[in-house]
């Protein structure tokens, strides 16, 4: 009769062994099978995105005479209307992401926009130290480069939601030039500076295939006689075609505003690029 209680105890211990192994890997019992992570933007260790970007561009530009007296300014120009620069672009954009351990991410992106125009001036234009007369044919160009490095740490991370912030660094370069070939007059100004930004990164996995993500970088500063702000925002809805390939549609906007008074290159510029994006993303 004592055989049955012993058999019952053995069966009970056998049923409890997998649970014990799950809680205590050193117990010697077999470990439960490891569950592989489901592919998603939250579990990707690396990705490269190639996007087609069609932004509308709005540019306000003013270049004042060097060392001018107070109250003396150049002519404020709408670059698209007054100088004939294109108001819409068709661009390719590349972005990389490297995940550093579980919560850290480094995003690398690059954007450039070179525009030129050739148009007769409707009014007299004071551009730096030169004055271009109405009716003259003016050649102008604005070249823009932005290379960004953004590190974020996810202070909240789950299977469905990830939110992080950190520090960004953008290397910006701009060059603007204007010329009237008939009068052999020309004026050019350029600037290149690194700027730190405050980023915010957000990802929401709606389902196993759909996800929404957004990230933004922002900075505003005033140093001596110069002041400016920079904003870079991107959002997208992603469809995961297979574990390593996704397609997405989204919206991107970049804004730059800079004003400087006095010195050799005083003036102001404000640019905005905003429009839809479609992209393909390879990840693992």
Predicted regions mapped to residue ranges:
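N-terminal signal peptide c-region/cleavage motif recognized by signal peptidases
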Residues: 14-16
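Short glycine/proline- and aromatic-enriched beta-strand/turn motifs that initiate or cap beta-hairpins
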Residues: 20-113, 275-277, 281-283
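Residues that define the transmembrane beta-barrel architecture of outer-membrane proteins
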Residues: 44-46, 88-92, 143-147, 161, ...
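Residues on the lipid-exposed face of transmembrane beta-strands in outer-membrane beta-barrel proteins
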Residues: 50, 94-98, 108, 149-153, ...
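Transmembrane beta-barrel strands of outer-membrane/channel proteins
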Residues: 50-56, 108-112, 165-171, 202, ...
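Extracellular/periplasm-exposed beta-strand and loop segments of Gram-negative cell-envelope proteins
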Residues: 58-89, 112-145, 171-192, 221-224, ...
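Repeated loop/turn-to-beta-strand initiation elements of outer-membrane beta-barrel proteins
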Residues: 103-106, 159-161, 208-212, 241-247
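Outer-membrane beta-barrel transmembrane domain signature
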Residues: 170-243, 254-257, 284
């Amino acid at each position: 009769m004592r055989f049955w209680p012993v058999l019952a105890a053995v069966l009970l211990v056998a049923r409890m062994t997998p649970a014990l192994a799950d809680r205590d890997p050193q117990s010697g019992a077999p470990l439960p099978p490891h569950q592989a992570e489901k592919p998603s933007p939250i579990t990707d260790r690396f990705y490269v995105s190639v996007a087609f970007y069609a932004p509308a561009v709005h540019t306000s530009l003013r270049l004042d005479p060097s060392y001018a007296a107070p109250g003396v300014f150049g002519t404020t120009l709408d670059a698209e209307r007054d100088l004939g620069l294109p108001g819409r672009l068709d661009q390719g954009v590349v972005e990389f992401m490297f995940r550093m351990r579980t919560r850290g991410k480094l995003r690398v992106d690059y954007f450039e926009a070179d525009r030129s125009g050739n148009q007769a001036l409707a009014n007299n234009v004071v551009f730096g130290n030169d004055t271009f007369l109405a009716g003259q044919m003016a050649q102008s160009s604005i070249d823009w480069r932005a290379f960004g490095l953004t590190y974020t740490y996810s202070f909240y991370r789950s299977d469905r939601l990830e939110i992080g912030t950190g520090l960004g660094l953008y290397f910006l370069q701009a060059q603007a030039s204007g010329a009237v070939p008939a009068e052999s007059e020309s004026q050019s100004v350029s600037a290149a500076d690194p700027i730190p930004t405050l980023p915010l990164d957000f990802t929401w996995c709606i389902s196993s295939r759909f996800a929404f993500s957004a990230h933004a970088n922002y900075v505003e500063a005033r140093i001596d006689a110069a002041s400016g702000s920079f904003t870079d925002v991107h959002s997208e809805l992603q469809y995961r075609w297979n574990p390593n390939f996704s397609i997405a549609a989204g919206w991107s906007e970049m804004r730059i505003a800079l004003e400087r008074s006095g010195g050799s290159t005083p003036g102001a510029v404000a640019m905005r690029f905003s429009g839809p994006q479609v992209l393909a993303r390879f990840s693992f």
